[in-house]
UniProtKB/Swiss-Prot annotation:
Residues 285-312 are annotated as: Basic motif 2. Residues 247-256 have a biased composition (Polar residues). Residues 117-165, 279-333 form the bZIP domain. One of its GO terms (molecular function) is DNA binding. It comes from Phaeodactylum tricornutum (strain CCAP 1055/1). Residues 129-138 have a biased composition (Basic residues). This is bZIP transcription factor 14. Residues 55-149, 234-272, 400-468 are annotated as: Disordered. The keyword DNA-binding applies. One of its GO terms (biological process) is cellular response to nitrogen starvation.
């Protein structure tokens, strides 16, 4: 913007000159100029740049020229751009406040501020990425610890089941040994693990959580309600010692309100919100957020430490069970080899009797003509135990069959002795019945019932007629 033509009056004071400009709105503005001695030769003219505040108020006034003589008055236009530049002719000592930048160009501090904001934004984004990765890493660590603890628990249950099966097999093998088998000295820790139930095995769900924190001044009414019934229920509440009990309960409630010294301003958090200023409320909010964040970190840290300790304990217990199981395997092999000979000897002695010779189980014999490649392989421990049990069942079955045959022979002997004492008519009748029974091979042998004779009579056979 340019000044329109205006009347100019210059003061004749040598130290100070006042330029009065009258614009189109008949308003005056004064500009104070600093006077400096001018050279004797050459034109004396100064281009004055109106300050920014004056240009904002008076957008029509921008620049003026001051001449050394009263008669020379002129105005020139600047050709340096959209904004004029204040220049001095013939006097380098005059200080000017001209600006070399145009209005359309941006200030110098704008690029620096933009770079600073961009750098801060990148830093915040980088921090968010690191925080997210840290949370994800801790979450995966906790999940891995939980899975490890669960696997160790299942492994311990499986080891205990295998040990119980081995103990049962050792008991069955020890029944046929000549002497009483002495059980090996077990580790008391292993014995305690074997008698421990599945519910008592450590589990991630049994880890205690961080206790709730009661801030000072909060839930005070609940504490009083809980403390009063305790005093009323005591038998000495109505006696002289009631006052002492009330004092003790108040002391306990005061002790319960003790908070840890962890850098959190709990006194500020315990203030009454209705009596706080907005600044204090904002400070309380920030402090509360800090407290919750810190307790969350502490809770995760405690859970991780407890899980690591639980995994370590389960690994030690499983190692003890594996060592004990290895000892049982070696003992079972040695006992099976020593007792197998005794079992075979007892079975041979039982089967050597004539009544059980026919009931002896077949034995697999190795032919001499077999080549070494055709020899049977060495049976495993389970096969040996199974063969021993099968042999025992066969022996028990042979004893049962022998007893049945003995019971069948007793009625036959009784029937023969009774038939000799009866009359001839009865004996013939019995002989016919016996023949009928012998002819019927499908029916099982049954015990015959005979009547006891009441008297013994003798009969003479009738003489045959002559010529019969």
């Amino acid at each position: 913007m340019r000044f329109p033509a205006a009347s100019v009056a210059v003061d004749s004071t040598p130290q100070l000159r006042l330029l009065q400009m009258k614009d189109s709105h008949e308003t005056y503005s004064t500009v104070q100029l600093v006077h400096s001695p001018l050279p004797e030769k050459g034109p004396n003219s100064v281009l004055v740049d109106v300050p920014q505040q004056i240009s904002r108020r008076k957008p029509t006034a921008e620049q003026s020229f001051v001449s050394g003589s009263d008669s020379s008055r002129s105005s020139t236009k600047s050709s340096s751009g959209s904004r004029p530049v204040m220049t001095t002719t013939a006097d380098p000592n005059i200080v000017t406040a001209a600006s070399t930048e145009s209005v359309s160009s941006s200030p110098k501090w704008l690029p620096k501020k933009a770079d600073t904001d961009d750098r801060v934004q990148r830093s915040r984004e980088r921090n968010r990425i690191h925080a997210r990765k840290t949370r994800q890493r801790k979450k995966e660590q906790m999940q891995s610890l939980e899975g490890r603890a669960t696997d160790l628990k299942h492994e311990q249950i499986r080891l205990k089941q295998i040990i119980n099966e081995k103990n049962t097999a050792n008991i069955l093998v020890g029944l046929f040994s000549k002497g009483q088998s002495q059980s090996p000295n077990e580790d008391p820790r292993v014995e305690a693990l074997m008698y421990r139930s599945v519910e008592e095995i450590p589990d991630p769900s049994k880890i205690p959580e961080l206790p709730a924190l009661i801030l000072p001044g909060q839930h005070a009414s609940k504490k009083i309600k809980v403390a009063v019934p305790v005093v009323a229920a005591s038998p000495q509440s109505m006696s002289d010692g009631g006052g002492e009990e009330v004092a003790s309960t108040s002391d306990v409630s005061g002790d319960e309100q003790q908070v840890p010294d962890d850098g959190i301003d709990y006194d500020l958090l315990g203030k009454d919100r209705s009596k706080c200023t907005p600044e204090e409320l904002d400070q309380i909010r920030r402090e509360r957020n800090r407290m919750h964040a810190k307790r969350t970190r502490d809770r995760k840290r405690i859970f991780t430490e407890e899980m690591a300790e639980m995994c370590r304990i389960l690994e030690e217990e499983n190692h003890l069970l594996r060592v004990h199981l290895g000892g049982l395997d070696s003992d079972f092999k040695s006992e099976s080899t020593t007792t197998s000979t005794h079992v075979v000897d007892r079975i041979d002695s039982v089967l050597s009797t004539p009544t059980l010779a026919s009931c002896a189980p077949p034995q697999d014999m190795v032919s001499v003509s077999l080549s070494p490649s055709q020899l049977p392989s060495k049976p495993s421990t389970k096969e040996v135990a199974f063969n021993q049990l099968q042999t025992l069942l066969d022996v028990a079955g042979s004893f049962e069959r022998q007893q049945r045959e003995a019971e069948r022979k007793v009625p036959q002997m009784c029937s023969i002795s009774a038939a000799s004492d009866t009359s001839t008519s009865d004996s013939s009748h019995h002989h016919r019945q016996r023949r009928c029974h012998k002819g019927d091979s499908d029916r099982p042998v049954k015990r015959q019932r005979y009547q006891v004779p009441r008297s013994i009579t003798t009969t003479t056979s009738l003489a045959a007629p002559v010529g019969w």
